[in-house]
């Protein structure tokens, strides 16, 4: 039987644990310091479904969780590459895939890899495909998958470690 690192560590452990780390990552305590992202831009992103509005009474875009800030940085980066908001929304859905199973997190996959990067300092990458779908994973798994799949599509490569600094 082949060992599946992701299945054991994410699906088998992280997703089902109530970790204090998840609570900290998802606690709204940080201000957004990206001058290009105004409240108007945030409202537009909310209207297109790229971000979820979790504001109390729908007022004030002043506080975000660490995970939300990482997601906003990723949106900015993907927009710099010319990806449309509709395609970014597809990527959001990929990252939110396991949110129904995790009461603590909107983006369990991001939280998992944030914990992994902080704990082990190994390289984690994002691959964003032309249709907006994305993969996130350790460099070793993504490299192995690319070598296995001879018909691999082109993608945008984003260094997750650099994104979260």
Regions found by a protein language model. Give the residues of each.
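Basic helix-turn-helix/winged-helix DNA-binding cores
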Residues: 1-71, 76-83
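Acidic, low-complexity cytosolic segments
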Residues: 84-88
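Exposed, interaction-prone assembly regions rather than primary DNA-binding/catalytic cores
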Residues: 91-165
């Amino acid at each position: 039987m082949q060992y599946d690192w992701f299945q054991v560590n994410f699906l088998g452990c992280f997703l089902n644990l109530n970790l204090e780390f998840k609570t900290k990552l998802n606690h709204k305590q940080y201000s957004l310091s990206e001058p290009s992202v105004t409240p108007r831009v945030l409202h537009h992103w909310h209207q297109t479904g790229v971000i979820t509005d979790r504001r109390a009474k729908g007022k004030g875009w002043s506080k975000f969780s660490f995970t939300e800030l990482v997601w906003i940085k990723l949106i900015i980066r993907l927009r710099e590459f010319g990806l449309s908001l509709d395609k970014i929304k597809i990527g959001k859905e990929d990252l939110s895939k396991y949110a129904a199973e995790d009461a603590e997190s909107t983006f369990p996959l991001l939280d998992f890899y944030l914990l992994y990067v902080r704990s082990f300092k190994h390289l984690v990458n994002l691959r964003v495909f032309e249709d907006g779908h994305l993969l996130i994973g350790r460099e070793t798994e993504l490299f192995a998958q690319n070598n296995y799949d001879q018909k691999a599509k082109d993608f945008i490569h984003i260094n997750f470690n650099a994104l979260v600094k």
